[in-house]
């Protein structure tokens, strides 16, 4: 009985076109299966021969699979065939099954479905004017007496998706217990600030539309809010009492753009 030699050092296998035998170190073994003369494309005067053998050995019960791909000249060929890239491609396409690579894309809705982090806070401008809801969709700044402080608007500040740069943090400002968010829109050629009603089943969300997003920047003990959609436009209040909160284009002038923020406990 033939012994199992080492695959590299001792085993020598040759293909016989006449008797379809796999010759080993000791004696020939009859092939279990054989596929010959496969037409894998135009190869000039050569052809491809694929031979597969399954041999079992009693000692180890191992299956040895030998795949031999041989290039041969026709016996009466007058010249040698030059091996080209197309020939290799034909061989590989036979051995390997080509499958398309599918790139899956996900919408932002799924990429940004993490819970939104938010805090409750109150805002007063540097003149200590409080922000109150004067009508369903109008926010005004005015001085309140101590017994009127319950009129002060409580904001739900959500930390949303966006580029953080130079200590600027993207946030959205909604009014607590209301489906209202501060948003920036253009009326004519001028960006303006408004309170926009939203669907509470959708908002707040991580990927807020840009009109709702402001860059919150801390400056000493105050904060300012710059529109992401309209850079260099800021949430502002007037020096005049009981004027609507608006979107201003100037800092450090008559318009007030810096606020004191009081964070409330959850």
From Swiss-Prot:
GO CC terms: cytosol; extracellular space; lysosome
Protein's recorded name: Interleukin-1 beta
Subcellular location, principal: cytoplasm
Biological process according to GO: cellular response to lipopolysaccharide; cytokine-mediated signaling pathway; fever generation; immune response; inflammatory response; positive regulation of canonical NF-kappaB signal transduction; positive regulation of cell division; positive regulation of immature T cell proliferation in thymus
Reported function: Potent pro-inflammatory cytokine. Initially discovered as the major endogenous pyrogen, induces prostaglandin synthesis, neutrophil influx and activation, T-cell activation and cytokine production, B-cell activation and antibody production, and fibroblast proliferation and collagen production. Promotes Th17 differentiation of T-cells. Synergizes with IL12/interleukin-12 to induce IFNG synthesis from T-helper 1 (Th1) cells. Plays a role in angiogenesis by inducing VEGF production synergistically with TNF and IL6.
Site positions (Important for interaction with integrin): 168, 176, 178, 187, 201
Note: IL1B production occurs in 2 steps, each being controlled by different stimuli. First, inflammatory signals, such as LPS, stimulate the synthesis and promote the accumulation of cytosolic stores of pro-IL1B (priming). Then additional signals are required for inflammasome assembly, leading to CASP1 activation, pro-IL1B processing and eventually secretion of the active cytokine. IL1B processing and secretion are temporarily associated.
Family label: Belongs to the IL-1 family.
Gene Ontology molecular-function annotations: cytokine activity; integrin binding; interleukin-1 receptor binding
Coiled-coil ranges (or none): none
Chain residues in the propeptide: 1-113
Entries under Pfam families matching the protein: IL1, IL1_propep
Cross-referenced PANTHER family: INTERLEUKIN-1 BETA (PTHR10078:SF30), INTERLEUKIN-1 FAMILY MEMBER (PTHR10078)
Entry superkingdom: Eukaryota
UniProt keywords, alphabetically: Cytokine, Cytoplasm, Inflammatory response, Lysosome, Mitogen, Pyrogen, Secreted
Keyword Calcium (UniProt): no
Subunit note: Monomer. In its precursor form, weakly interacts with full-length MEFV; the mature cytokine does not interact at all. Interacts with integrins ITGAV:ITGBV and ITGA5:ITGB1; integrin-binding is required for IL1B signaling. Interacts with cargo receptor TMED10; the interaction is direct and is required for the secretion of IL1B mature form. Interacts with HSP90AB1; the interaction facilitates cargo translocation into the ERGIC. Interacts with HSP90B1; the interaction facilitates cargo translocation into the ERGIC.
Entry's localization field: Cytoplasm, Cytosol; Secreted; Lysosome; Secreted, Extracellular exosome
């Amino acid at each position: 009985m033939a012994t199992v030699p080492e695959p590299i050092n001792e085993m020598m296998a040759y293909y016989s076109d006449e008797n379809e035998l796999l010759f080993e170190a000791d004696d020939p073994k009859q092939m279990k299966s054989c596929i010959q003369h496969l037409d894998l494309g135009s190869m000039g005067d050569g052809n491809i021969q694929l031979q597969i053998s399954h041999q079992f050995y009693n000692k180890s019960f191992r299956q040895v699979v030998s795949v031999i791909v041989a290039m041969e000249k026709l016996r009466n060929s007058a010249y040698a065939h030059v091996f080209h890239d197309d020939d290799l491609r034909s061989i590989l396409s036979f051995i390997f099954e080509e499958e398309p690579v599918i790139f899956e894309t996900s919408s932002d809705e799924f990429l940004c479905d993490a819970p939104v982090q938010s805090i409750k806070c109150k805002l007063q401008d540097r003149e200590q004017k409080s922000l109150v809801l004067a009508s369903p969709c109008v926010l005004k700044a005015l001085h309140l007496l101590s017994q009127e402080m319950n009129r002060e608007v409580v904001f739900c500040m959500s930390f949303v998706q966006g580029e953080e740069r130079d200590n600027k943090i993207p946030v959205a400002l909604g009014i607590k217990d209301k489906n209202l968010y501060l948003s920036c829109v253009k009326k004519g050629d001028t960006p303006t600030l408004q309170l926009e009603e939203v669907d509470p089943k959708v908002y707040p969300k991580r990927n807020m539309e840009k009109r709702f997003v402001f860059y919150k920047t801390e400056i000493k003990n105050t904060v300012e809010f710059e529109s992401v959609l309209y850079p260099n436009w800021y949430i502002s209040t007037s020096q005049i009492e009981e004027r609507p909160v608006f979107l201003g284009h100037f800092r450090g002038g008559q318009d007030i753009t810096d606020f004191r923020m009081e964070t409330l406990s959850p």
